[in-house]
Each structure stands twice: as structure tokens, then as C-alpha cells.
């Protein structure tokens, strides 16, 4: 398989990765005590606080995810960024003065001083679980998958189909919505959660064009179509599906990412983390703005004003509404003003890896300026990330482009 990256691309990618790690370790080389390790010696300037808060909250998968949600849902998703300002202001003027007055290193330390050690241990355990399950697992998954797909090249796309049953629950039809490509052997067919050995795919030039029935399949739900999955059949490795990453490569990617990130975090302390966060924030902002510029420069889009005008004329599929109806299935306006606000107060005011950046500031003033600057950068995301996803929605429609099946 040919890599999608050239030798120059590989040199830049891995060179910058290890350069950032090395620079972070070098920055944290003079740590002498706990305050240096946990709070960067309380010497961080406002721009370091801003860059580290932004970099800790926003990552490549965050930017890409917001583009995807903009494509699928629309501008209402921007409330995750806009209403974050309320949480940042709460941290800035209510929580932060208390934390800094008590001279705590971590929020666990604050709970220990305010209540007791049981509170400290309970909070620490909860935060470890949240960080691992909600943040690290998706980050490692997306990172390893992305790197492997770039390195191993085009391995094809999965087929997508749905099954229908008659009123008696007997399978009547399997509709192929997308035939995929690069199938070298017949994959197994799964309807719902069960593999069906008596179904076999019909292959033509590496694509699935139909399904053969060897006997009746019963016990299905007649009321709605059921998803059909195709397992295995890759032209290079029959054990995996087209577009998948080989399990060994996937695990190796996670291991490398864990070693690289763990090295500068564990050995460099908070100062190393802040330095690398600032670098990554600058790169993310520049890359996001560049992607937005390229997308909005396409003749089918023609800039923000033309996108707004086109969306106004797209009755029924508008993407630029800021508020959805109260019965919207995923993001009603009532949820924005209630549950989302509660989430922000927790995330920005009592979240260890956010608050610790502000605690490392050299003064209350520097901390506040840094927090407010991070909020400004957050307000850019709806336009260069979510807005780009909305523009991509209309661009894909005009060019009749296919959306990747795992998007």
C-alpha cells in the first residue's frame, strides 16, 4: 500500500511532533519543587494561560468534530462555544480568587482544605475516570486511526446497506445504499447485531452490488429498515473491512501517542504542558483559518455573505439557525439555556486541567486576561470550524460528492 503522505510530509509531520515534545521537556528542565511542577512556578504570563486553556480544550478532533456537526446539524452547535463564555467568566471572577487565596495546587487540594480527605480522593477518582473515558479514549482512537490511514494509504470504503422485512418478520430485501470498494473476498453479513451465514454478497469489481439469500431469515422487525454491516473482505487483508486499520497498527499508534505525550507531561511538568499547548493552539488556529479560507473561496460558496443568502433560500434544510425548536432531537434551545449552562460551569470552573492553567499565572490580573483571551479564541470556532462545515454541506451538494461512511 502506498502512503498518502510523501517523504517530505512524513519528515514535517514526525519532525514537528518530536520537536514539540523536546521543546516542552527543555522548557520544564529547571523545576525544583512542587510549585514548579504543578503550577509552573506561578510565573505564567497571560498569553501562556490563554494558549494553554484553549489548547487543553480544543484539539484537532475538536475542530474536525465541530466541522462535522456543522455539516450535519448546523450553526446551533456553536452554543457549545458561545455559552462557554459564561463558564469562563464564572471562573474568572468567582472561583479563581478563592482558589488562589487558598494557595492550592490542585482542585483536590482545595476540597481537602475546604472539607476533608474523602472529598479529595473522591474528586480525584471521578476526574481520572472522566478524563480517561471521555477525553483520552476518543483522542487516542481518532489520532491512531488518522495516522494509520494516512500512512497505509487508500484501503477502500465500507459498503452500506439496509434490510427490510415483510409483515411476518421474514427478510424480504437488502438494499445496497453504497457498494464500497476494494473488496477482494466475500465479507460476512451482519443484520442488526447477528451475523447471517445464509446471506452472501454479490461482488463486481470490488464493490458489493447485491445480496443472495440461501434460505428465509425470520424474526426481524417488520416496522423499520435495519442496518446491514459487512465484516472483512479487504483486498489486502481479508480479516478486516475496507477502510479499517489493522489491529496491530492501531495499537501501535496508540502506544506511540501515549509515549510522546506522556513523556513531556510526566517529566516536564505543567510548564512543559503550557509551552506545548501554546504551540499547538497557534498551529490549530492557523490551520483552521486556512481550511476555512480555502473552503469559502470555492466558487460554489463565494464567501460568508453568499453562504448566508443561500441558506436563507434553502427552506427545510437551513444550517445557519442559531436556535433550534424546543422539540429538536439533539440540541433544543431549552437544553442550551439549562443543561448546557450547568455543563459549562462545571467544565470551566471546577475542571482540574482547565483551572490549573489559571492557577499558574504570575498574578490575578494575568490570570484574568488569559482567561478572557481564551474566551475570545473560543468565539472564533463557530465561524472558522462550524461555518466551514456548513459551507462543506452545500459544496458537497453542488459537486455530488459522497460522504465517508464513518463520518
Regions found by a protein language model. Give the residues of each.
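Membrane-interface "cap" regions at the ends of multi-pass membrane proteins
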Residues: 1-63, 268, 366, 370
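Membrane-embedded alpha-helical core segments of multi-pass
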Residues: 19, 87-94, 103-104, 264-268, ...
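Conserved, function-critical positions that sit in or immediately flank catalytic
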Residues: 154-244
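Extracellular loop-to-transmembrane helix junctions
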Residues: 4-28, 44, 48, 68-104, ...
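Residue-level recognition of pore/gate-forming positions within transmembrane alpha-helices
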Residues: 17-20, 56-57, 84-88, 128, ...
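Helix-loop-helix module between adjacent transmembrane segments
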Residues: 78-157, 236-257, 261-265, 339-347
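Membrane-water interface regions at transmembrane-helix termini and the short interhelical loops
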Residues: 1, 69-71, 95-101, 109, ...
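Loop-to-helix junctions at membrane interfaces in multi-pass transport proteins
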Residues: 2-5, 42-44, 48, 65-79, ...
Amino acid at each position: 500500500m502506498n502512503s498518502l503522505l510523501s517523504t517530505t510530509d512524513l519528515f514535517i509531520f514526525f519532525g514537528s511532533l518530536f520537536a514539540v515534545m523536546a521543546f516542552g521537556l527543555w522548557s520544564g528542565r529547571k523545576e525544583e519543587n512542587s510549585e514548579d511542577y504543578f503550577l509552573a512556578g506561578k510565573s505564567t504570563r497571560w498569553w501562556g494561560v490563554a494558549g494553554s486553556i484553549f489548547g487543553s480544550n480544543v484539539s484537532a478532533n475538536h475542530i474536525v468534530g465541530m466541522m462535522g456537526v456543522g455539516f450535519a446539524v448546523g450553526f446551533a452547535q456553536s452554543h457549545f462555544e458561545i455559552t462557554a463564555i459564561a463558564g469562563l467568566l464564572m471562573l474568572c471572577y468567582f472561583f479563581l480568587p478563592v482558589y488562589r487565596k487558598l494557595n492550592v495546587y490542585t482542585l483536590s487540594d482545595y476540597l481537602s482544605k475546604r472539607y476533608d480527605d474523602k472529598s479529595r480522593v473522591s474528586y480525584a477518582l471521578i476526574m481520572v475516570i472522566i478524563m480517561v473515558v471521555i477525553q483520552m479514549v476518543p483522542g487516542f482512537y481518532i489520532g491512531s486511526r488518522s495516522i494509520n490511514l494516512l500512512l497505509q494509504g487508500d484501503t477502500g470504503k465500507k459498503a452500506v446497506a439496509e434490510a427490510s422485512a415483510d409483515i411476518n418478520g421474514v427478510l424480504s430485501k437488502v438494499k445496497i445504499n453504497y457498494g464500497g470498494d476494494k473488496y477482494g473476498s466475500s465479507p460476512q453479513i451482519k443484520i442488526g447485531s447477528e451475523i447471517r451465514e445464509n446471506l452472501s454478497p454479490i461482488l463486481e469489481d470490488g464493490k458489493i452490488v447485491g445480496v443472495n439469500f440461501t434460505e428465509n431469515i425470520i424474526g426481524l422487525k417488520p416496522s423499520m429498515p435495519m442496518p446491514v454491516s459487512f465484516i472483512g473482505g479487504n483486498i489486502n487483508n481479508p480479516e478486516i473491512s475496507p477502510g479499517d486499520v489493522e489491529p496491530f497498527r492501531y495499537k501501535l499508534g496508540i502506544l506511540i501517542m501515549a509515549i510522546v505525550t506522556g513523556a513531556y507531561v510526566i517529566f516536564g511538568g505543567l510548564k512543559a504542558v503550557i509551552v506545548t499547548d501554546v504551540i499547538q493552539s497557534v498551529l490549530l488556529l492557523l490551520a483552521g483559518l486556512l481550511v476555512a479560507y480555502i473552503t469559502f473561496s470555492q466558487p460554489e460558496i463565494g464567501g460568508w455573505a453568499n453562504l448566508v443568502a443561500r441558506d436563507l433560500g434553502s427552506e427545510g434544510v437551513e444550517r445557519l439557525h442559531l436556535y433550534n425548536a424546543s422539540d429538536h432531537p439533539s440540541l433544543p434551545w431549552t437544553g442550551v439555556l439549562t443543561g448546557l449552562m450547568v455543563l459549562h460551569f462545571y467544565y470551566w470552573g471546577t475542571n482540574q486541567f482547565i483551572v490549573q492553567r489559571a492557577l499558574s499565572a504570575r498574578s490575578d490580573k494575568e490570570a484574568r486576561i488569559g482567561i478572557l483571551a481564551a474566551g475570545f479564541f473560543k468565539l472564533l470556532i463557530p465561524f472558522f470550524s462550524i461555518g466551514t462545515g456548513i459551507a462543506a454541506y452545500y459544496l458537497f451538494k453542488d459537486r455530488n460528492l459522497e460522504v465517508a461512511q464513518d463520518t
